[in-house]
Every structure is written in C-alpha cells, then in structure tokens.
Swiss-Prot record:
Its main location: cytoplasm. The keyword Signal does not apply. Binds 1 divalent metal cation per subunit. It comes from Vibrio cholerae serotype O1 (strain ATCC 39315 / El Tor Inaba N16961). InterPro entries: SurE (IPR030048), SurE-like_Pase/nucleotidase (IPR002828), SurE-like_sf (IPR036523). Nucleotidase that shows phosphatase activity on nucleoside 5'-monophosphates. NCBIfam families: PRK00346.1-3 (NF001489), PRK00346.1-4 (NF001490), surE (TIGR00087). Pfam families: SurE (PF01975). It is found in: Cytoplasm. This is 5'-nucleotidase SurE.
Length: 250
C-alpha cells in the first residue's frame, strides 16, 4: 500500500510528521508538501512561475508552491506510474470547520487528490498540542478503510478535538456548520508610516447546533464530514429557470 501525504503548514510541520509516523508500518509513505506555511491557500494553483521541487529526505519532497500544486505534481508527475492508494492531508495545526473549508489549504490538498481519482481525507487538530490523539484517529480510520473501504467516493474532512486521547468520546458523522462574517480588518502602521492591514479574527459560530462539526468538537467528539465538489444549488434550479423565463426571456 502507498499513501501520499501533503498539508498546508509546510513540509517541516509537526502535524505532517505525526501523520507519517502513525502510518509507516502500514504503508509506503511519500510526503510532498509546501516549502513553507501556505495556510489559507485554498485551491489556488501556481501559474506565473515554475514549481521548484527539492528532495529533502527519502520519499520527502519540498515544493515551492501551494498545497494543490503539491498534490497535482505528485499524482501527475512524481507518482504517475504507480498512484497512491490514499491521499491524506494534515494533520493541520488548527481546526477546519464549517465554511472554513472554503479557505483551507489542508482541505484543498485532499480535494485535489479527489479530483484526480484517489480516495482522499483531510485531517485537522482543533489546536496545536495533542497530535498524538489526532494520529490515533488517523490510524484508526485508515485501518478501517483497509478492512472495509470507505463506502463513498466523497472527500472526507476529519477534525479531532485538541484533548488527551482518554477525553475524546469517539467519532461522529457531521455536516458543516457556519460562521458569522469575519471581524473587520485590523489597520496598523508600518515603520515608515504606511497603512497596513491584517485580516481580523474569524467570526463566531452562526450554525453550530447538533449535527454540525462545531457541535461535535465542542463536545469532545471527532467530526467526520463527507464533502462534495459540486457547488450547484440544485434546489434553486427550478426557481431560477422560472425566473429567467418569466422575467428575462419574457
């Protein structure tokens, strides 16, 4: 078995090495990850300059690019003659819950694997401390997949509470919650007196009730959310067709 690992925190991040260590005795591990932190890169690709790739250790590659670049390169070049059985992204340093998944490079790396036909899972720790807890559930889910393959071709988004293992309740299948709009920009001055701006903190949860990923994490459960790439609002197709015919086309 062969597993491709990537992330958005960078090739030297603690999370991706905790992920690798949890699985080395189960599969051949290949790491292809950004050369630096690329959090928030979403599904962006590098188009205006070439990708520079460095092998920094056995089966470990650093890419001057985004998480999506990394998986695209790995599956279309590095591993094209022997594709991996799984693409795993993470373990992210921080949760990817609700609509955060739209910005997440961690989820995007797994999504690229999904686009290219490989079962893919994104893993995130809701903090930066208990990577051993996250690694335990990574291993559990991969072993379950080996014994009984995941019954869907959907991309999976998994978030693990940042708690000691004995304080985690188990795994719960969830839907995405939602946040309020992010807080306003933070305006500052640079040393030369020019205005600079930082993104404000994320908005508070708006939809975090039972059944959501937010609710699971808050209660000490691992959240497992199947995601789909189709962004079509299928329930609106009929009303939009009616609107177009009646209001636009006469």
């Amino acid at each position: 078995m062969k597993i491709l690992l990537s992330n958005d925190d960078g090739v030297y991040a603690q999370g991706i090495h905790a992920l690798a260590d949890a699985l080395r005795d189960l599969a051949e591990i290949v790491i292809v990850a950004p050369d630096r932190n690329r959090s928030g890169a979403s599904n962006s690709l590098t188009l205006e300059h070439p990708l520079r790739v460095s092998q920094i250790a056995e089966n470990t590659y650093s890419v001057q690019g985004t998480p999506t670049d990394c998986v695209h390169f790995a599956l279309n070049e590095l591993m094209k003659d022997a594709l991996p059985d799984l693409v795993l992204s993470g373990i992210n340093h921080g949760a990817n819950l609700g609509d955060d998944v739209l910005y997440s490079g961690t989820v995007a790396a797994a999504m690229e694997g999904h686009f290219l036909g490989v079962q893919s899972i994104a893993f995130s720790l809701a903090g930066t401390t208990h990577f051993a807890s996250a690694a335990h559930f990574v291993r559990q889910l991969v072993e379950q997949h080996l014994a009984n393959p995941i019954p869907t071709n959907r991309l999976l988004n998994v978030n693990i509470p940042d708690r000691p293992l004995e304080l985690i309740q188990g795994i719960e299948v969830t839907r995405l919650g939602a946040r309020h709009h992010a807080e306003s920009m933070i305006k500052q001055k640079d040393p030369r007196g020019h205005d600079i701006y930082w993104l404000g903190p994320p908005g508070k949860e708006q939809d975090a009730g039972p059944g959501t990923d937010f609710h699971a994490i808050e209660r000490g459960w691992v959240s497992l959310t199947p995601l789909q790439v189709d962004l079509t609002a299928h329930e609106s197709l009929r009303s939009m067709d009616h609107w177009l015919k009646e209001k636009v086309n006469g």
